[in-house]
Every structure is written in structure tokens, then in C-alpha cells.
């Protein structure tokens, strides 16, 4: 076993990487509130795992979406638990994200030279809320349908381009199958890639600049 490790160590310098990851300086003023970003990440990982599990059974059509959710809840082994964890961790992720933003703002973590870290964090917050909006519609029940109708109709108040934005979101002039398809694609493909990219940028900046000092 040691020979295998030595072979990889010689080529990849695994120990040096491990030392760099585990020996970063942590300022003495850091407390439990500085863990809120990490808790948000844990919630996202739970979201990813449980959401991926549900894609095996969910059907993104207006005629089958609600019934497929009922099937997950009543027929799939531990389906009720997986979906419940997905919903609970979604609420927890939004809450932890909000608290994290407030903590960073109140402790001045957005100031020079960490402006870009703050900007990527704000983008991540917007993506998180968008996850919630798109996911809320997927059961395609009365609550989900009317939520989509209201949210997708908001841009109509924008002069000139408002109607075009609404049609782009809905896939037409009214809420229907095209709308559900768009929201499902956003929720399961577009947003996960976006949040992964901005998370990577966010974490790399934090690793490079370290944790901000006290006010």
C-alpha cells in the first residue's frame, strides 16, 4: 500500500496539497457565526443528493408532475423522507444564506480587498433564491401553478421589454407545459452549473485572501 501511495506522492505531491489545505491560519476572533457559509454549503450538498435521487421518478409534464410527486411520497422506498429532507434543507439553505450575508456585512467582510468575494456571494444568494422559486413550481399543484403565474408575470411591469421577458419565462403567453419545462431545466441543469462555478470562484478567493479581520 505504501508503494502505491509513494507512486502517487512522487507525481502529485499529495502531502503538500494536504498540508496546504489543513494548515491555513484561522484568526482568533473567529466564532460559530463564521461557519454559516459552510452550513449553507452542506445544505446545498444535501439538496443536490436528494434532488438527484428524485429525478429518477419525477416526470416534468403538466399531466404527470403532481402524480409523480405523490408516487415518490407514497410508493418509493424512503421517498417521503428524501423529499422531506429536500424541502427542509431548502428552507435551511435560504435561512443560512441570509444569516451568512448579514454576518459578512456586519463584520465588514465585503471591504477591500474582498469586494469580488462579496460580489460572487451576492450572485450565489440570487441563484439560491432562484432555486427556491423554480423548485416551488415543480409539484405543479395549485400552490406551484399560481406561484409560477405570479412570479413569471412580475417582469411585465418593465417598460418595452416586459412582455418579451414574460413570454421567454413562460414559453408563450400563458403558463403551461413550456413553462414547467423551462423551470425544470433551470432547476436541474442551468442553476446547478451556475452555482457550481460561482461557488468555486467564491471558495478560491476565500482560500487566497483568508478570513477578514475584526472591525
From Swiss-Prot:
InterPro entries: Cyt_b/b6_N (IPR005797), Cyt_B6_PetB (IPR023530), Cytb/b6-like_sf (IPR027387), Cytochrome_b_N_euk/bac (IPR048259), Di-haem_cyt_TM (IPR016174). One of its GO terms (molecular function) is metal ion binding. It is a multi-pass membrane protein. Its cofactor is heme b; heme c. Heme b 2 binds at residues 86, 187. Keywords: Electron transport, Heme, Iron, Membrane, Metal-binding, Photosynthesis, Thylakoid, Transmembrane, Transmembrane helix, Transport. PROSITE patterns: CYTB_NTER. Pfam families: Cytochrome_B (PF00033). GO terms for biological process: photosynthesis; respiratory electron transport chain. Heme c binds at residue 35. It is found in: Cellular thylakoid membrane. It comes from the Bacteria. Heme b 1 binds at residues 100, 202. CDD domains: Cytochrome_b_N (cd00284). Binds 2 heme b groups non-covalently with two histidine residues as axial ligands. Binds one heme group covalently by a single cysteine link with no axial amino acid ligand. This heme was named heme ci. GO terms for cellular component: plasma membrane-derived thylakoid membrane. The chain crosses the membrane at residues 32-52, 90-110, 116-136, 186-206. Component of the cytochrome b6-f complex, which mediates electron transfer between photosystem II (PSII) and photosystem I (PSI), cyclic electron flow around PSI, and state transitions. HAMAP family: Cytb6_f_cytb6 (MF_00633). The 4 large subunits of the cytochrome b6-f complex are cytochrome b6, subunit IV (17 kDa polypeptide, PetD), cytochrome f and the Rieske protein, while the 4 small subunits are PetG, PetL, PetM and PetN. The complex functions as a dimer. Belongs to the cytochrome b family. PetB subfamily. Heme 1 (or BH or b566) is high-potential and absorbs at about 566 nm, and heme 2 (or BL or b562) is low-potential and absorbs at about 562 nm. This is Cytochrome b6. It comes from Acaryochloris marina (strain MBIC 11017). The lineage of its organism: Bacteria, Bacillati, Cyanobacteriota, Cyanophyceae, Acaryochloridales. The gene is petB.
Amino acid at each position: 500500500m505504501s508503494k502505491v501511495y509513494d507512486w502517487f506522492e512522487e507525481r502529485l505531491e499529495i502531502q503538500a496539497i494536504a498540508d496546504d489545505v489543513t494548515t491555513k491560519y484561522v484568526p482568533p476572533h473567529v466564532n460559530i457565526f463564521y461557519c454559516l457559509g459552510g452550513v449553507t454549503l452542506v445544505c446545498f450538498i444535501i439538496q443536490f443528493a436528494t434532488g438527484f435521487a428524485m429525478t429518477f421518478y419525477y416526470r416534468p409534464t403538466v399531466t404527470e408532475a403532481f402524480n409523480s410527486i405523490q408516487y415518490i411520497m407514497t410508493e418509493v422506498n424512503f421517498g417521503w423522507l428524501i423529499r422531506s429532507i429536500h424541502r427542509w434543507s431548502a428552507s435551511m439553505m435560504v435561512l443560512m444564506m441570509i444569516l451568512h450575508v448579514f454576518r459578512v456585512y456586519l463584520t465588514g467582510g465585503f471591504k477591500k480587498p474582498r469586494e469580488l468575494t462579496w460580489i460572487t456571494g451576492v450572485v450565489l444568494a440570487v441563484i439560491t433564491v432562484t432555486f427556491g422559486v423554480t423548485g416551488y413550481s415543480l409539484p405543479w399543484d395549485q400552490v406551484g401553478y399560481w406561484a409560477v403565474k405570479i412570479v413569471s408575470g412580475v417582469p411585465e411591469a418593465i417598460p418595452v421589454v416586459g412582455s418579451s421577458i414574460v413570454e421567454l419565462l413562460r414559453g408563450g403567453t400563458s403558463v403551461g407545459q413550456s413553462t414547467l419545462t423551462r423551470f425544470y431545466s433551470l432547476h436541474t441543469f442551468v442553476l446547478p452549473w451556475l452555482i457550481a462555478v460561482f461557488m468555486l470562484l467564491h471558495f478560491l478567493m476565500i482560500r487566497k485572501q483568508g478570513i477578514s479581520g475584526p472591525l
